[in-house]
């Protein structure tokens, strides 16, 4: 555990040297230590880092492009430099995809469900987040969080996770920005039209939380981050709830939604 913790500290503090691009929170503030109990850190020794969400004691939900060799998973982390007594470390026992983790041809299949090698114990800083019971409404105010960059394009990275409030926007706005997106997809378009707040490099795989439920997974966005009228893309978790719950129930051959 000590070795894993030291490695995680180095990764979080040296994210600017990471080999893989992902998303981070711009324009937010330090998350309250008790508001991100479901937020997990995915990392390896090569410098890859992503976020994820604990959805029950045995499963984490994240983005497919966050798959990495020799993945380690940390739960209950708030500060990269100060250890929480209840932090827990796990390995992935099994990974489930709707699409090959290396295939980026389908915009809305960037989702990965991870079964942990051991169950997680709830604690002061660790608790699962509920899956959505319905999709978010247009205009909903939602919370995005992670250890991603807090400045862009010259990235700097925080010692603690940052949180920001953003809005669910019309899908057509994202489609106008990101050429090649289909007329309909299982993607949420979210951000602030005036810019200044959004996920950024390092936040990939982390949660978009609306009314206390996991509605989105940080998937893709602009570079530099948080540009005016350039919202980011989030996987629409509601459309995958049957797939997720079927796997958790033991049906690991369930068909991914088309």
Curated annotation (Swiss-Prot):
Where are the active-site residues found?
Answer: 65 (charge relay system), 110 (charge relay system), 204 (charge relay system)
Report disulfide bridges, numbered on this chain.
Answer: 31-163, 50-66, 98-256, 142-210, 174-189, 200-225
One GO term under biological process is: proteolysis
Which gene specifies this protein's sequence? TLG3
Q: Which family does it belong to?
A: Belongs to the peptidase S1 family. Snake venom subfamily.
Organism, by scientific name, is: Craspedocephalus gramineus
What is the purpose of this protein?
Answer: Snake venom serine protease that may act in the hemostasis system of the prey.
Q: Name the tissues where it is expressed.
A: Expressed by the venom gland.
User: Any idea where this protein resides?
Assistant: Secreted
Lineage of producing organism: Eukaryota, Metazoa, Chordata, Craniata, Vertebrata
Name recorded for this polypeptide: Snake venom serine protease 3
- Carbohydrate-modified residues: 44, 103, 117, 121, 154, 251
Enzyme nomenclature, EC number: 3.4.21.-
**Molecular function (GO) terms listed?**
serine-type endopeptidase activity; toxin activity
Q: How does it assemble?
A: Monomer.
Q: Which GO terms describe its cellular component?
A: extracellular region; secretory granule
């Amino acid at each position: 555990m000590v070795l894993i913790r030291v490695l995680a500290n180095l990764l979080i503090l040296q994210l600017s040297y990471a080999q893989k691009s992902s998303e981070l929170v711009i324009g937010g503030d330090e998350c309250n230590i008790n508001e991100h109990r479901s937020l997990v850190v995915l990392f390896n020794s090569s410098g890859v880092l992503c976020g994820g969400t604990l959805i029950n004691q045995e499963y984490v939900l994240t983005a497919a492009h966050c798959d990495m060799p020799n993945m380690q998973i940390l739960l209950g982390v708030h500060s990269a430099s100060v250890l929480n007594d209840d932090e827990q470390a796990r390995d992935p026992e099994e990974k489930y995809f709707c699409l090959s983790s290396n295939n980026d041809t389908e915009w809305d299949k960037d989702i990965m469900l991870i079964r942990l090698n051991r169950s997680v114990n709830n604690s002061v800083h660790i608790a699962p987040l509920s899956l959505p019971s319905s999709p978010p409404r247009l205009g909903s105010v939602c919370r995005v969080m992670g250890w991603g960059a807090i400045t862009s394009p010259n990235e700097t990275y925080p010692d603690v996770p940052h949180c920001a409030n953003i809005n669910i926007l019309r899908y057509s706005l994202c489609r106008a920005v990101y050429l090649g997106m289909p007329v309909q997809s299982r993607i949420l378009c979210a951000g602030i039209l005036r810019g200044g707040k959004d996920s950024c490099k390092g936040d990939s795989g982390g949660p978009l939380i609306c009314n206390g439920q996991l509605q989105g997974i940080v998937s893709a966005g602009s570079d530099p981050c948080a540009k005016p009228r350039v919202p980011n893309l989030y996987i629409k978790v509601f459309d995958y709830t049957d797939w997720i719950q079927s796997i958790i129930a033991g049906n690991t051959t369930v068909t991914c939604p088309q």
